Each structure stands twice: as structure tokens, then as C-alpha cells.
């Protein structure tokens, strides 16, 4: 029996929609497993981080001891820096060799932990879909693509190891199809537990520096409204190079994309520096003055996200 054309078109639309929903569910399941693999597997590897015209080579070691998650990141080129994460506490050995910056109870995570704890929520702001299969570090990977649903975030792709579900590559691509940043393993060993001594925080003879005083009172003074989907994950007062007084710093995230807002008083002797929008390199930056303060928004996000966030800032 042949269906009338008036019924055939809606049926085809329903079939297409069903296929899209099924593929989105498959993509989210890959992301769920990628999130767990990055937190639960033991692995050691070397990866490259490319952002704009810059490139860094880093080594990561990850170990799970019962309920204790240990991670070490070492920068292999340029001045030596290393980060040790013990659950939610991060210890950063600075390049001067004398200082360890300590950041307690932070939400910050390092590659390959690029997938948030609730990937299903990403469907509100991205269209998840499966791409092809490519090799990374000699291993077959399933590509998971996150296409933005609006102008406030860039497209992202994650290459997930088909055997272990560990993310081996991630990439942010702007609206022109140009890679903004890329993390990619060049070599990786999965399954072997790194030695526990690798994660010892060596404080002898070094000065501890708090990464920033946590505030919790930003809403009492400032009103900031980021784009839909972005929620505040960090708020602190922290010192910054070249600035004499601590700066209010808040970070907003949708789970994949992050943007930062800095608020600092403009002193009489200051020339306020950058104002307006700058989009050169991997980071976009937007700065403006608000009631005697300089507000700066920056991140690997579209300019629209920075403008909407910074232009919303006002004193209560």
C-alpha cells in the first residue's frame, strides 16, 4: 500500500528525528564512559597542547588509590613547572623553584579529564553526535562532536579510545572552522599504575602560596549575568603579575567551555590598559570600565559570550 504524500513527509521527519535522537544518546554514552575512564584508570603519557601560535609538551601521570585520585602534570619544555592534584587539591610548583601555589577544593581538572560529570546536561547547549574513527597515539578512537546550539560557545570534538574509553585528544574549533586549541597524546600507556612516590608534594625549603582567597560574597557587591548555561564554578581574590592589589576573579563554565571575569579597582596612577575587544590568538579578551573598576572577560569562547558577560557587570 502506498502512503499519501501528505502522510509520507511527516513520517520521514519523524524517522529522521528518531535517528538523530538515537545518535545523540549514543554520543552522550561515549562521553559518560570517557568521564569515568579519565578519573578511574591508571595511565602515563605525553601530550601536546596547542593554543594559537603556541605549543607546549606535557607529561601526565594518573593513579587511583581507592577513593584517592592522584594526578601529576609536568611541563617538559621551557621553565619547569609541575602540578600535582590530590582529589580536589592542586599543588603547583612554580618555575622559580622556590614556591608552591596551593589551591584547595578546586573544580579545576586537567586533560584528559575534559568531560564533565553529567554529560547529559550538555545536550541543552550542544548537539552531541558521533563522528568517524581515527587513530591517536596509535590507538583507534571514536570521535564525539559537540556542535553549539547558540553563539555563546564553540564546537568541540573529543577523540575517545575505543578500547578503554579514555579521551586521547580534544579540540575547540571556532565559527570559521579554525582550531582554537588542541590537546593530543603522542604516546600513552594505559593500565599500569604509576609509582606512588611520583605524587609526593615536596615542600621542604619552599614557600607555600595560597592560589586565592575564596570569597563567596561577590553577589553582595557585583551583579554578573553570563550567557545561558554558564554557571559560576570559582570565585576568589588573587594576586596577578604587575597588579599591586589582589583582583576579584570568577570563572563560569557550561561543562565544556570556560570564561573568566576579573574585576580590579582603577587607581589614580593607572592607565587602564586594554579596553574593548581583542580576538587575536587562542583567547578572546574584552575589557571595559565600570564605576571606577576595570572589568576584563576572557576565554576560549566566542566574543558574544565575553561581551554579554562583561556588559552585564554592574555594582549593586
Predicted feature descriptions by range:
Residues 106-156:
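Intrinsically disordered, low-complexity linker/loop segments enriched in Gly/Pro
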Residues 2-3, 14-15, 20-69, 77-79, ...:
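N-terminal leader/targeting segments and the immediate start of mature chains
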Residues 54-113, 169-186, 190-192:
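An acidic-aromatic
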Residues 38-40, 62-71, 84-89, 139, ...:
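Short, solvent-exposed coil/turn segments at beta-strand boundaries
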Residues 135-205:
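Gly/Pro-enriched, hydrophobic low-complexity segments
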Amino acid at each position: 500500500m502506498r502512503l499519501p504524500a501528505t502522510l509520507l513527509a511527516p513520517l520521514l521527519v519523524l524517522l529522521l528525528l528518531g535517528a538523530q535522537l538515537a545518535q545523540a544518546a549514543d554520543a552522550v554514552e561515549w562521553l559518560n564512559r570517557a568521564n569515568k575512564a579519565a578519573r578511574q584508570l591508571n595511565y602515563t603519557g605525553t601530550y601536546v597542547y596547542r593554543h594559537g601560535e603556541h605549543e607546549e609538551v606535557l607529561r601526565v601521570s594518573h593513579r587511583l588509590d581507592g577513593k584517592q585520585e592522584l594526578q601529576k602534570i609536568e611541563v617538559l619544555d621551557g621553565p619547569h613547572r609541575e602540578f600535582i592534584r590530590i582529589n580536589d587539591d592542586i599543588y603547583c610548583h612554580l618555575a622559580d623553584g622556590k614556591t608552591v601555589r596551593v589551591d584547595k577544593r578546586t573544580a579545576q581538572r586537567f586533560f584528559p579529564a575534559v568531560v564533565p560529570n553529567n554529560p547529559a546536561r550538555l545536550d541543552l547547549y550542544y548537539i552531541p553526535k558521533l563522528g568517524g574513527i581515527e587513530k591517536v597515539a596509535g590507538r583507534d578512537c571514536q570521535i564525539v562532536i559537540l556542535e553549539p546550539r547558540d553563539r555563546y560557545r564553540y564546537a568541540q570534538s573529543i577523540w575517545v579510545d575505543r578500547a578503554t574509553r579514555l579521551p586521547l585528544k580534544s579540540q575547540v574549533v571556532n565559527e570559521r572552522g579554525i582550531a582554537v586549541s588542541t590537546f593530543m597524546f603522542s604516546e600513552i600507556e594505559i593500565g599500569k599504575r604509576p609509582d606512588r612516590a611520583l605524587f609526593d608534594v615536596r615542600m621542604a625549603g619552599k614557600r607555600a602560596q595560597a592560589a586565592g582567597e575564596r570569597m563567596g560574597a561577590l553577589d553582595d557587591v557585583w551583579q554578573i549575568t553570563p550567557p545561558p548555561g554558564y554557571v559560576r564554578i570559582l570565585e576568589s581574590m588573587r594576586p596577578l603579575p604587575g597588579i599591586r592589589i589582589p583582583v576579584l576573579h570568577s570563572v563560569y563554565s557550561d561543562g565544556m567551555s570556560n570564561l573568566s571575569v576579573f574585576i580590579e579597582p582603577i587607581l589614580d596612577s593607572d592607565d587602564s590598559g586594554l579596553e574593548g575587544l581583542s580576538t587575536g590568538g587562542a583567547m578572546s579578551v574584552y575589557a571595559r570600565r565600570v564605576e571606577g573598576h576595570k572589568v576584563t572577560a576572557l576565554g576560549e569562547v566566542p566574543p558574544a559570550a565575553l561581551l554579554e558577560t562583561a556588559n552585564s557587570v554592574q555594582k549593586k
